[in-house]
Amino acid sequence: MAKIQLVAQANLPTEYGIFKMVGFEFLDTKKEHVALVMGDISNADEPVLARIHSECLTGDALHSLKCDCGFQLATALKQIQEEGRGVLIYHREEGRGIGLINKIRAYSLQDKGMDTIEANLALGFKADERNFEVCADMFELLGVKKVRLMTNNPEKVETMKKAGINVVERVPLNVGENRYNTKYLDTKAKKMGHYIVHNNDEQHLMTCPHCQEEII
């Protein structure tokens, strides 16, 4: 088990209901992660609706349309609210682990024509620098053994299984596609094996506020 510990918790009222915010910290690096917990998750035999959400300042806080992160965060919290119980782990690995400034550098390369993977490689990073094992450690500290994991990323599922977390179901999270992120989603599907279902059909183009200006 990684050297991470549960260090603080408090109630957090949100537009999706009241969550318990749980803070975790690595003993050596002092790096922090957070989990949002709703309802009673103490029954280890009952699968918990869960989401591992990697930090994305641009999508989560600044409402960027270049990715689907902000849409996934909102949808996951709403689904937990509807379920009445669940866990969202906020995984502090900005920019797939390369950090915010390098993410901006990667965006600059994408403006010049590279895709999201090519940009990371050009900067000297792997396609994905994240380590999801710490998320399994956080689940364990929360007493969660079985999850219904909201994700399109097969690596998250496999990492949880290898770490001893029983993923009984993968819940798709295909939301937020628009004309600014279709290439990004396509790249994740083709080069990273993500389970992406495109929504760029005629009905989507007619109803999506981010696509309408393209067809007027």
Swiss-Prot record:
Active site, renumbered: D128, R130
For activity, the cofactor(s) needed are: Zn(2+)
Q: Which UniProt keywords apply?
A: GTP-binding, Hydrolase, Metal-binding, Nucleotide-binding, Riboflavin biosynthesis, Zinc
Check the record and name the CDD domains matching this protein. GTP_cyclohydro2
- Tell me where on the tree of life, at the top rank, the source sits: Bacteria
Give the pathway annotation.
Cofactor biosynthesis; riboflavin biosynthesis; 5-amino-6-(D-ribitylamino)uracil from GTP: step 1/4
Q: For binding GTP, which residues are annotated in this chain's numbering?
A: R51, I52, H53, S54, E55, Q72, E94, G95, R96, T116, T151, K156
SUPFAM superfamilies documented for this protein: RibA-like (SSF142695)
What Pfam families does its record include?
GTP_cyclohydro2
Question: Which reactions does this protein catalyse?
Answer: GTP + 4 H2O = 2,5-diamino-6-hydroxy-4-(5-phosphoribosylamino)-pyrimidine + formate + 2 phosphate + 3 H(+)
Query: So what EC number does this one have?
Result: 3.5.4.25
GO MF entries? GTP binding; GTP cyclohydrolase II activity; zinc ion binding
Which GO CC annotations does the UniProt entry carry?
cytosol
GO BP terms: riboflavin biosynthetic process
Q: How is the cofactor bound?
A: Binds 1 zinc ion per subunit.
Binding of Zn(2+), residues: C56, C67, C69
Q: NCBIfam families per the record?
A: PRK00393.1, ribA
Membership in a protein family: Belongs to the GTP cyclohydrolase II family.
Sorted alphabetically, which HAMAP family does this protein's record hold? RibA
What is this protein's function per UniProt?
Catalyzes the conversion of GTP to 2,5-diamino-6-ribosylamino-4(3H)-pyrimidinone 5'-phosphate (DARP), formate and pyrophosphate.
Name-wise, this protein is: GTP cyclohydrolase-2
* Species this chain originates from: Haemophilus influenzae (strain PittEE)
Q: Which gene encodes it?
A: ribA
